[in-house]
């Protein structure tokens, strides 16, 4: 009896194992299809060869259905686009003994030439081959997934397209009765882009009270060391401040992508530390406080060498780059006997100080006794002027860039009108008034007027530059102003960002 029971149990177990194996064989593993996109775009009369990869499907059979009609049973398929535009659905099926897998594909056919582009990368568009060489071609964007794009032109009149957002952009060329259309498919690139500064190329502040402190100089540091320290402060999303010192001091930096010049919008912002006065005694005064405007130069990487070249720079035409006469504070400055001239060809030379020994100790928080060396750093300019920069009681380090071996440094550029007024009349309350737009460290970072429109860029002869975008920025201090016990007006830079990548939309200023 026990032997019979044991034999019966053995048969039941064997039957279960066989049944399980049979069930697994019946179910199997479904075919796996790869190597096909969900969507394809083709121009009329174009052919597309589709080569799917089918796995886990020995002895499989295949079927291609175009718009519901079987067209082929081969493992590959050639789609022949018709001569008219339209939308098509293609289904690929792979069948095996274990089941059926399928891939549904959408194919758009149009009278255009599809081209792929990466977001925030300039795409040159070729002249249509069918157009006569003498034809005058007009280009326009006829349809766009987003407003964040630019269709511009090179100096050789080559069309250049760039999009700040992924999507589809239809770009048409017209010449008389002739038409040609590109469908630009902008996609995110393989590398992750950041809206912030990614590289610092150069740094040379002019003498000033924060020089050798922001960033901190250490004995033996070279120019390369100070550029690296500047990069450590400015690169990335958590920047810290650097100083440009007195007039002419500069920093040059870049981004890991081209910032798109979107029509009608501000495109980027360079951060400073400007703020408004909270106790200005002047009634109904225009905005002012600590406004130390830095002039902006921009460039895009024409030759794709990854660095700014001397022939690529364009001036951002701020509101006071030609004259300050339209600034709200201009008449106030004239009455105050400020030097309100604007020099577009200014040169200033600073000389290494002869001594760091104090004339007198000076007194902290004393507007009348702040100077420790009155004839500290000698300067001359190309307008026949000369004088000395004062050393104050608040900062004891040398104001001359300590890593510079030369005994003099010359800077060149635009010198803006003097925007600072002692509103106390006693040397105790200086207000530096803001220019209307177009500068760094001129308005608080949260204010729209701290944002920059690339369309403000001009050529050397003052014409609009019409840049498609920019890769590099240079900022230099645009004012030469001593403000009593506050010291010199010194542009500070505390980072920069691409407004479009951050989703910040600010309309431009139109005059």
Provide a role label for each language-model segment.
Residues 185-294, 312, 317-511:
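A domain-level signal for the mature, folded cores of soluble proteins
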Residues 301, 305:
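Acidic carboxylate motifs that coordinate Ca2+ or other divalent cations, activating on Asp/Glu
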Residues 45-55, 123-138:
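A short beta-strand segment in extracellular, disulfide-stabilized domains
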Residues 86-90, 165-171, 471:
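Exposed beta-strand face motif in extracellular beta-rich ectodomains
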Residues 56-63, 135-139, 143:
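Solvent-exposed loop segments of extracellular immunoglobulin-like
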Residues 94, 173-175:
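Conserved structural position at the C-terminal beta-strand
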Residues 63-81, 143-161:
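Surface-exposed, flexible coil segments in extracellular/virion-facing regions
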Residues 1-47, 51-53, 97-116, 181:
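Bacterial Sec-dependent N-terminal signal peptides
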């Amino acid at each position: 009896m026990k032997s019979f029971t044991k034999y019966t149990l053995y048969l039941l177990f064997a039957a279960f194992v066989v049944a399980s194996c049979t069930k697994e064989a019946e179910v199997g593993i479904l075919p796996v299809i790869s190597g096909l996109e969900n969507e394809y775009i083709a121009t009329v009369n174009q052919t597309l060869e589709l080569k799917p990869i089918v796995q886990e499907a020995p002895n499989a059979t295949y079927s291609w259905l175009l718009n519901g009609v079987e067209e082929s049973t081969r493992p590959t398929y050639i789609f022949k686009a018709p001569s008219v535009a339209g939308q098509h659905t293609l289904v690929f099926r792979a069948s095996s003994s274990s089941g059926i897998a399928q891939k549904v594909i959408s194919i758009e056919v149009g009278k255009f030439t599809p081209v792929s582009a990466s977001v925030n990368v300039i795409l040159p568009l070729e002249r249509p081959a069918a157009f006569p060489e003498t034809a005058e071609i007009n280009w326009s964007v006829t349809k766009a997934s987003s407003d964040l794009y630019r269709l511009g032109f090179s100096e050789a009149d080559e069309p250049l397209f760039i999009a700040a957002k992924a999507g589809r952009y239809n770009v048409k060329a017209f010449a008389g009765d002739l038409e040609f259309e590109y469908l630009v498919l902008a996609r995110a690139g393989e590398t992750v882009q950041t809206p912030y500064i990614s590289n610092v190329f150069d740094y040379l502040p002019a003498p000033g009270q924060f020089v050798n402190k922001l960033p901190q100089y250490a004995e033996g540091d070279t120019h390369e060391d100070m550029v690296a320290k500047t990069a450590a402060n400015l690169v990335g999303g958590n920047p810290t401040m650097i100083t440009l010192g007195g007039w002419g001091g500069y920093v040059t930096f870049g981004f890991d992508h081209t910032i798109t010049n979107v029509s009608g919008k501000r495109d980027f912002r360079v951060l400073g530390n400007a703020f408004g006065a909270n106790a200005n005694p002047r009634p109904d005064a225009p905005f002012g406080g600590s406004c130390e405007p830095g002039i902006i130069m921009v460039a895009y990487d024409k030759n794709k060498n990854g660095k700014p070249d001397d022939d690529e720079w364009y001036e951002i035409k701020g509101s006071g780059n030609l004259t300050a006469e339209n600034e709200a504070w201009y008449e106030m400055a004239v009455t105050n006997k400020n030097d309100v001239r604007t020099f577009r060809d200014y040169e200033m030379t600073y000389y290494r100080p002869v001594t760091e020994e104090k004339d007198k100790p000076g007194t902290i928080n004393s507007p009348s006794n702040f100077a420790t060396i009155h004839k500290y750093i000698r300067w001359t300019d190309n307008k026949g002027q000369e004088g000395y920069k004062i050393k104050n009681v608040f900062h004891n380090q040398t104001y001359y860039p300590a890593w510079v071996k030369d005994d003099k440094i010359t800077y060149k550029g635009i010198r803006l009108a003097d925007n600072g007024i002692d509103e106390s009349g006693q040397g105790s309350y200086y207000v530096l008034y803001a220019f209307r737009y177009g500068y760094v460290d001129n308005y608080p970072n949260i204010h729209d007027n701290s944002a920059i429109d690339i369309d403000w860029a001009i050529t050397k002869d003052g014409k609009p530059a019409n840049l498609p975008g920019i890769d590099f920025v240079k900022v230099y201090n645009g004012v030469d102003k001593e403000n009593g016990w506050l010291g010199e007006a010194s542009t500070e830079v505390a980072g920069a960002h691409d407004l479009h990548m951050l989703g910040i939309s600010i309309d431009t200023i139109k005059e």
